[in-house]
Amino acid sequence: MTRIAINGFGRIGRNVLRALLERDSDLEVVAVNDLTEPAALARLLAFDSTAGRLGRPVTVDGDTLVVDGRRITVLAERTPGQLPWKELGVDIVLEATGRFTSAEAARAHLDAGAKRVLVSAPADGADVTLAYGVNTDAYVPAEHTIVSNASCTTNALAPLAAVLDELAGIEHGFMTTVHAYTQEQNLQDGPHRDPRRARAAGVNIVPTTTGAAKAIGLVLPNLDGKLSGDSIRVPVPVGSIVELNTTVARDVTREEVLEAYRTAAQGPLAGVLEYSEDPLVSSDITGNPASSIFDSALTRVDGRHIKVVAWYDNEWGFSHRVIDTLELLAAN
């Protein structure tokens, strides 16, 4: 078993643990570090407003979470370099606080005794950025100890872009994600560094920024600098959709585009890219573990101009890619 510690037991940290409980994996979560009381963490794991009840017993024994019989040490340390990873025999740290998102900051986990760090966000200076299934081969175990999993949106965009680029060569493009609100927004109007995100998340459509278009160049170097984009946050708790508008190098037909995505979803990107002909809405894809759920009916083609669209569960799908990447690191 590979011993995993989760630093930050928020939306992604808890969803990763939930997903691990459903998978046959050699990963063992032995510790979580969060500044919240263990009893509160136990409740948040057991009862979830979007994922539902866990359906497995969760109790607290002092500073230990007991989840379906598995004992997980709970820590409350603000400084990653002070965490007892060496004493706990931790192999890999999942850095999921959203705070320590640079290689320099994440390196503190290595100093504390971990062998590798996976950052569940874009990370400046990371040894490699992976969108599992799309650029998995970029991982070089001997060289990469601090790995970024990019973001949920990058993981949804990457299969879309990769298939289209291979089919016809993307020259340039724009992406827009219509994204569920997140904890980083305000519940009610209040101060925020982004004046739009300052407004109440549950009652507004909120235009804002996304780093996904920039990050795609780290995953697919051939597309570096070719895409730009924006995000629109909307009043749903989970379930997002990304639209990619591109100009490609040659004329293509709509059927060529659809066939390329069908083939990829059944072959090299199986489990990461899903092909759908159903008239989906956001609630239909919650709980779907794919990174990217291609909505074939929304495909538009006009010669060299192409629009493709994919849904994604921005929590559950991304959490499964985190686990896939942890398993990749553990095996190498």
PLM region spans:
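C-terminal active-site/capping subdomain that shapes the small-molecule cofactor and substrate pocket
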Residues: 229, 241, 245-332
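Generic structural signal for well-ordered, non-membrane alpha-helical segments
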Residues: 9, 13, 102, 150-153, ...
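Short, solvent-exposed beta-strand edge segments and adjacent coil->beta transition regions
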Residues: 1, 143-144, 200-202, 239-243, ...
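Generic structural signal for residues in well-ordered beta-strands
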Residues: 72-74, 227, 308
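Generic secondary-structure signature for well-ordered alpha-helical cores
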Residues: 21-25, 162-170, 180-183, 210, ...
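Short, flexible turn/loop "capping" segments at secondary-structure junctions
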Residues: 139-141, 197, 234-240, 300-303
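Acidic, glycine-rich segments within the central catalytic cores of soluble metabolic enzymes
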Residues: 166, 170-237
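N-terminal Rossmann-like NAD(P) cofactor-binding subdomain of oxidoreductases
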Residues: 1-198, 322-328, 332
